[in-house]
Amino acid sequence: MLKPLGNRVIIERKEQEQTTKSGIVLTDSAKEKSNEGIVVAVGTGRVLDNGEKVAPEVKEGDRVVFQEYAGSEVKRGDKTYLILNVEDLLAIIED
């Protein structure tokens, strides 16, 4: 498993739908990458100038929305994860 350092999180990106609302089946090249995902690991947080540590606002299992072109993709086995800074998270999805 990957363990993020500092103020980073690891996201498992939500899969895009295979078909459109009108029933058209999309190929992998036609699908846009989703900017939603599940937090699978959280780093220890950031350190302020005064030495105080601030923990990230998200936790493992949170569904989040992140900036479209943020982060770096990393493959582990058959899964692809996205490592990004907490600042690149835009919202937590609450249902």
Curated annotation (Swiss-Prot):
The keyword Chaperone applies. It is found in: Cytoplasm. InterPro entries: Chaperonin_GroES, Chaperonin_GroES_sf, Chaprnonin_Cpn10_CS, GroES-like_sf. GO terms for biological process: chaperone cofactor-dependent protein refolding. Keywords: Chaperone, Cytoplasm. SMART domains: Cpn10. GO terms for molecular function: ATP binding; metal ion binding; protein folding chaperone; protein-folding chaperone binding; unfolded protein binding. Pfam families: Cpn10. Transmembrane segments: none annotated. It comes from the Bacteria. One of its GO terms (cellular component) is cytoplasm. NCBIfam families: PRK00364.2-2 (NF001531), PRK00364.2-3 (NF001532), PRK00364.2-4 (NF001533), PRK00364.2-5 (NF001534). Together with the chaperonin GroEL, plays an essential role in assisting protein folding. The GroEL-GroES system forms a nano-cage that allows encapsulation of the non-native substrate proteins and provides a physical environment optimized to promote and accelerate protein folding. GroES binds to the apical surface of the GroEL ring, thereby capping the opening of the GroEL channel. PANTHER family: 10 KDA HEAT SHOCK PROTEIN, CO-CHAPERONIN GROES. Heptamer of 7 subunits arranged in a ring. Interacts with the chaperonin GroEL. This is Co-chaperonin GroES. The lineage of its organism: Bacteria, Bacillati, Bacillota, Bacilli, Bacillales.
